[in-house]
């Protein structure tokens, strides 16, 4: 019977991938002529509100929200659901703090990547090289882990062997990102956001039904372990320091993540931002609450999972009819794909704009070469990631731990202070980046938890301090000339 079941599961998945390809081809056809870099990496700055909200949410919500998060909720109970809700202001914070100023400056400097912004603001080559390298290293770690997550998911739910799953996954993402660019990435994010929303709601209803209603489900949880329904969670894991760290890492710190930040450069007008903030926050709320609650209540349906991470895929196959499970399986796949495509684009933009064009500025006019390079680099990066995920070395898992927090530690202050503090200069920004990055790497590697805080907290604080001290020694930045080619 498993054969029948898995073919029913795979059909919707294939259909879904086809739709994704269709959208990419559409994005390719819609490309505006001229200003290639601006179009490929930013979709010519033309996003409206709904699309902006969806792309931010879909980029922000990755495999972890569909796999790791609910897994933790399964293990620690309803308290974790509450903890997950701290993430709510993420959209509002990144659009509110960065959004407007960022977009205005980006248009003024004609910036395409985050590093363009940093260069225009601090006028330091060294800074841009450092930023580019840390970005590439971190993204390679983060993307590989997402790939692994995607393949594991297919393995559990549809019984597709790990290697096959990896190939299906990697090839389709690399292709559509390479050919469609930012526009394809954003359109697909919008589609993926919709799929995630519908999927979450359907699954939650299915679980509550299978557990025999909400009251019954909570009673079952209490019978398993009374702490599952207490605010502190099982093993009393949710202490105030833990909560603070979690908030800094996944909510406040998100402002510093390059692939979220770049979404702030690419919208149309203020109306789009205001709409984006409202819609985005609602979508994040529904998704976060839905997925984590599903994980926590899932314990009442399947009490004896050994690997909590598999709670969602297992529930899907158990609670939903095969065809519906297939559609829903597309949701976490969507989450993973939208996160990877954003990071892939960001990496290839970094290589081309910040490393290659910095060395050979005369190539800017050479549209054809840039087009080929962008596509080729995106594909090559995709291939490298596949290799890394094929036999995941221990290093990779460690890299990913570093990736998220490390990026925040490196980028957060130079970005925010660059926008809001007139006197910020290159010396300050460099010292902040080096202190933040190195400190985070050291603390995370040796698992040092100062006063029980996650390494991100001391790293950000000291990085801020380093910025202020370093700033004393630097020269003020000369006001850059207005470089403006587009409107």
Predicted regions located by residue number:
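Membrane-embedded helix-loop-helix hairpins and adjacent transmembrane boundary segments
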Residues: 2-487
């Amino acid at each position: 019977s498993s054969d029948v079941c898995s073919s029913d599961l795979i059909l919707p998945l294939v259909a879904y991938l086809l739709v994704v390809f269709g959208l990419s081809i559409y994005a390719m056809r819609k490309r505006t002529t001229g200003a290639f870099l601006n179009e490929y990496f930013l979709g010519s700055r033309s996003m409206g509100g709904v699309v902006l909200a969806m792309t931010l949410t879909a980029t922000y919500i990755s495999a972890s929200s569909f796999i790791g998060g609910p897994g933790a909720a399964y293990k620690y109970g309803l308290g974790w659901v509450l903890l997950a809700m701290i993430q709510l202001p993420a959209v509002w914070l990144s659009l509110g703090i960065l959004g407007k100023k960022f977009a205005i400056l980006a248009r003024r400097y004609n910036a395409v990547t985050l590093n363009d912004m940093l260069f225009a603001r601090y006028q330091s080559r060294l800074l841009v090289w450092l930023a580019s390298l840390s970005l590439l290293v971190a993204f390679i770690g983060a993307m590989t882990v997402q790939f692994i997550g995607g393949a594991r998911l297919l393995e559990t739910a549809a019984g597709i062997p790990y290697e096959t799953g990896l190939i299906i996954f990697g090839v389709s993402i690399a292709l559509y990102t390479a050919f469609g660019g930012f526009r394809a990435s954003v359109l697909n994010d919008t589609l993926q956001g919709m799929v995630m929303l519908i999927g979450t709601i359907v699954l939650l209803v299915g679980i509550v039904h299978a557990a025999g209603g909400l009251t019954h489900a909570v009673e079952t949880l209490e019978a398993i372990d009374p702490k599952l329904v207490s605010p502190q969670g099982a093993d009393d894991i949710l202490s105030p320091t833990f909560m603070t760290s979690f908030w800094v890492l996944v909510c406040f710190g998100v402002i510093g993540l390059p692939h979220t930040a770049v979404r702030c450069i690419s919208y149309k007008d203020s109306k789009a931002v205001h709409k984006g903030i409202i819609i985005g926050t609602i979508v994040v709320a529904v998704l976060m609450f839905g997925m984590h609650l599903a994980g926590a209540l899932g314990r009442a349906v399947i009490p004896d999972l050994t690997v909590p991470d598999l709670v969602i895929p297992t529930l899907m196959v158990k609670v939903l009819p095969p065809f519906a499970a297939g559609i829903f399986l597309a949701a976490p796949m969507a989450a993973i794909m939208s996160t990877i495509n954003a990071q892939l684009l960001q990496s290839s933009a970094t290589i081309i704009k910040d490393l290659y064009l910095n060395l050979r500025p005369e190539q800017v006019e050479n549209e054809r070469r840039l087009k080929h390079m962008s596509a080729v680099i995106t594909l090559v990066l995709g291939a490298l990631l596949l290799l890394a995920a094929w036999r995941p070395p221990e290093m990779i898992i460690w890299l990913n731990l570093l990736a998220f927090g490390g990026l925040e530690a490196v980028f957060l202050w130079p970005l925010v202070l660059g926008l809001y503090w007139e006197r910020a200069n290159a010396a300050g920004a460099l010292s902040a980046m080096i202190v933040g990055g190195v400190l985070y790497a050291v603390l995370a590697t040796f698992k040092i938890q100062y006063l029980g805080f996650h390494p991100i907290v001391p790293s950000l604080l000291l990085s801020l301090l380093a910025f202020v001290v370093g700033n004393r020694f630097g020269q003020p930045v000369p006001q850059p000339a207005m470089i403006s080619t587009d409107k």
